[in-house]
Design a protein with these regions (language model features):
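N-terminal alpha/beta PP-like core and its mobile active-site loop of ThDP/TPP-dependent enzymes
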Residues: 1-141
Length: 141
């Protein structure tokens, strides 16, 4: 079992304790630890899709079916951008979907790091983008 000291272990544990049985997504550099945390648990399953839009619509469908809260996970940059249409549909239809988006370390914000979506120094502002398709959006620091 992975050490319970990582933030991702706490996130996955909290999701599982809340009744979430599946996380849909595409693995990537800034989100891979979340999938590792899920792999060490028997009470939550990570379902990997071939595209982030597909993962977002899987989470939407999961929630619509009444199976539980739909959760989608993606990495920063292009990966997170690909979830926006699916999240927009869920938002417009008032379907609850939780999106978890990985980010580079905050010490690299605005310094040209790979797939920086911090909104600093000309980088894409992920929080502003997702605020348009969500009820609540915050970056955890």
């Amino acid at each position: 079992m992975a050490s319970g000291h990582r933030v991702v272990d706490h996130i996955v544990g909290t999701l599982a304790a809340s009744g979430v049985g599946h996380i849909f997504g595409v693995d990537g550099a800034n989100i891979e630890d979340l999938y590792d945390a899920a792999a060490f648990r028997d009470d939550i399953t990570a379902v990997l899709a071939k595209h982030e839009f597909a993962a977002a619509t899987m989470a939407d469908g999961y929630s619509r079916s009444g199976a539980g809260l739909g959760v989608v996970a993606a990495t920063s940059g292009g990966g997170c951008l690909n979830t926006v249409p699916g999240l927009g549909e869920a938002f417009a239809s008032r379907v609850p979907v939780l999106a978890l988006i990985g980010q580079p370390p905050i010490t690299l914000d605005g310094r040209g790091s790979f797939q920086d979506t911090s909104g600093r120094n000309g980088a894409l502002d992920g929080e502003a983008l997702f605020s348009a398709v969500s009820v609540f959006c915050r970056r955890v620091t």
